[in-house]
């Protein structure tokens, strides 16, 4: 559940400028870059070590990775606390018409940013939702025969960088995007992001989209580009393939066979006073990254602007977010890698494209290579399910 938000005219004019104009404004007289930064990682395809295969690049060289300190119960930002994409992420309330109403206190969503006034984060009568704002950023992903690359920049450093995570349906690059703080609950047939609610369940993709759209035309599923962008930032910050080890397991094993306990799915809001990032090394508690709960574990999440059409991965850089893949661009055909039928396993070999990373072999483990499981059915047309649930997160 997300939406693109608008920038003021000054920001839009800057963002819409062509690449040469942007770079010219960031260059010294000798042509060297003055303000542009790039934080990147290189992943060695032949190294199975979840940490050893990842190397820092460009401005990230020498930085200390971020990670939870499970002993102290604190999040250690390492060298990343003042990086632009961390500083420009904040919790807020967004009205049904898509305008930002006010910011929340980062350490207690029950309060507005002034630290005194009560917020509407748990108010079911509020005409809007609790959201996490992500501003700016350009992302570059590619591979060579031996390595994969993920690079973030504050500018469009070259033509290999895109900002599809903040591109509106009309193709205009906006200042940023909002992602729901909480897994949506269903209130009066509207999918809402509010604290203290039980997430909706047992809905198909069309039903979910109907309930999300009931907020207003500007509301939509979280897109593949938004989800991929956040995962890329987390990998860069932590310098590891194992995000659960770095940020928290999430509710990956809290399932109970009891409908009165919602089968172990947690109510929203348990992380309201935990700050921007927080997690546990237990397997039945919530996870929060970039002010958004349940990025993995607890409950599967559907995302839009990607479809696997009988084994062919298709993406939509921007547009109507349809669920069929109509008008989407082909990125990868699993058949080219000998993958067909219904398959699954821990990811090992992957292909890094400009649209993201896709696994093509599944003989890894929970502690090697990507450390995550993958399922695929090349016989159907479907949007992705990401993050896992409380029985297999």
PLM segments and residue spans:
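Short, low-complexity N-terminal tether/leader segments at secretion or assembly junctions of large
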Residues: 1-30
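Hydrophobic side chains in beta-strands
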Residues: 6, 17, 136-139, 181, ...
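Short, surface-exposed beta-strand/loop "edge" segments at domain boundaries and coil↔beta transitions
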Residues: 12-13, 49-50, 186, 392-393
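Extended N-terminal export/anchoring regions of large proteins
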Residues: 23, 27-188, 215-225, 230, ...
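C-terminal, surface-exposed recognition/capping segments
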Residues: 39-45, 226-228, 252-263, 271-272, ...
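Short aromatic-cysteine micro-motif
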Residues: 119-121, 125-128, 157-295
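A short, polar/charged loop-to-alpha-helix boundary motif
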Residues: 309-320
